[in-house]
Amino acid sequence: MTTLAVLSVASELFPLIKTGGLADVAGALPAALRANDVAVTSLLPGYPAVLGGIEDPQQVHSFNELFGGTARLLAARCGDLDLFVLDAPHLYVRPGNPYVGPDGKDWPDNGLRFAALAQVGAALGQGLLPHYKPDVLHAHDWQTGLLPAYLKYSGRPGPKTVFTIHNLAFQGRFPYELLGRLGLPERAFGLDGIEYYGGIGYLKAGLQLADRITTVSPTYAAEIQGSEAGMGLDGLLRLRADRLSGILNGIDTDVWNPASDALISATYDVESIAARARNKKVLQARFGLKPEPGALLYGVISRLSWQKGLDLLLEALPQLIGGGAQLALLGSGDAELEQGYAAAARKYPGQVGAVIGYDEALAHQIQAGADALLVPSRFEPCGLTQLCALRYGAVPVVARVGGLADTVVDANEMATATGVATGVQFAPVTTDALIKAFGKTRALFADVVAWRNLQINGMTTDVSWKNPAQHYAKLYRDLVAER
């Protein structure tokens, strides 16, 4: 089989830079695609963390002027990943995370910062480097939404494009006045181009102009064609439904492997699940919880936001505590929720612990030590924490939405009888339904055999990138064959 060359363009990539699940996908999918005769090179911005983490950087192109300054394109590696890094200090070398400054506000020039990434991605697809000609360009989320626009309006032929929605809530909307600085013609500003409610929509541009659209679960692909989850783009998504598909994410099962995880206190596998008790003890101590081995310990690893349903959990905490359970929460985000969980930890000492922030090692320890992992999201395109939870034997308790519905088999009567259940689902996404899920989870936890079966089923579920990579490889090959 002929090897396909794919350029993946994303604003973050693990292990170099990460703010969310996009980085995990961008970092793990290339290796899985290699087994399907797809060679991926990834283009990402030259943030300080990226420039400090790459190996053997070589300049392969220079730009005398790129949105207000000079820039270099570097070819480099990070482990087994092949990379292009856009080294543009005036755009990317600054404090804060990739999108916001230390004050928590979006950088005012984000429109230009990510237009540059998209423009260079398109240029690479059209022969910027004589020795590199990708068959497919795969762009991720709003930050790369202009990439197919740069291809379309250049007037020159280019490769096929795939645009993946990781979260429709983040749309990259900018004022019309930015158009004159983007290097796109006036005719690009139309309903069939980049125009969106009188301004410029980067995500909308990707959805409108890419050859194929994917999102990260089949259920989310269906949900976003409706008005509730479609967030103003459902009409366009319905129009392009024949070009839209949902492909579940996987996780890197080498990074997330309880049998070899150096970040957890005690390693274990499906044959030695009892060793999780040591991790639970360490986790309880880390969060200041009572050292009770028989207490049902819930873990949460999440952005603290309305989307993630963490306000509902805060409301339901008295019922969780009243049932004798404990909570270990790791997350940051909405200031009101941060304060709410910090206050809850003070109000319920020994039963609620909260670490505000993000700590990769602690996230691993929560997966290895919590009895159950709570994901009460109002919407969830795919979700990765529940996949890690399955892998680690932390029974997922999830809202029946998006990728959560696709990846967790609810312990209902039929699934329990047939021995396929892996967790607990609840619907609708309300405080009352969440409280009922606590009761169902508590009853399952009290049944030692039933709980162990949930853990075994979860730990033996294939949550790797093997199947998703096969779907992406087929998508790429089908696209190339359309020419």
UniProtKB/Swiss-Prot annotation:
Gene Ontology molecular function: alpha-1,4-glucan glucosyltransferase (ADP-glucose donor) activity; alpha-1,4-glucan glucosyltransferase (UDP-glucose donor) activity
Biological process, per Gene Ontology: glycogen biosynthetic process
Record keywords, A-Z: Glycogen biosynthesis, Glycosyltransferase, Transferase
Binding site for ADP-alpha-D-glucose: 18
Pfam entry (one): Glycos_transf_1
Cellular component GO terms held in the UniProt record: cytosol
Signal peptide positions (record): none
Ranges in coiled-coil conformation: none
Domain of life of the source: Bacteria
EC number: 2.4.1.21
Claim: Transmembrane helix is one of the keywords in the record: no
CDD domains in the cross-refs: GT5_Glycogen_synthase_DULL1-like
Pathway: Glycan biosynthesis; glycogen biosynthesis
Reaction(s) catalysed (UniProt annotation): [(1->4)-alpha-D-glucosyl](n) + ADP-alpha-D-glucose = [(1->4)-alpha-D-glucosyl](n+1) + ADP + H(+)
Function of the protein: Synthesizes alpha-1,4-glucan chains using ADP-glucose.
PANTHER family according to UniProt: ALPHA AMYLASE DOMAIN-CONTAINING PROTEIN, GRANULE-BOUND STARCH SYNTHASE 1, CHLOROPLASTIC/AMYLOPLASTIC
Protein family (similarity comment): Belongs to the glycosyltransferase 1 family. Bacterial/plant glycogen synthase subfamily.
Protein name (record): Glycogen synthase
Lineage of the organism: Bacteria, Pseudomonadati, Pseudomonadota, Alphaproteobacteria, Hyphomicrobiales
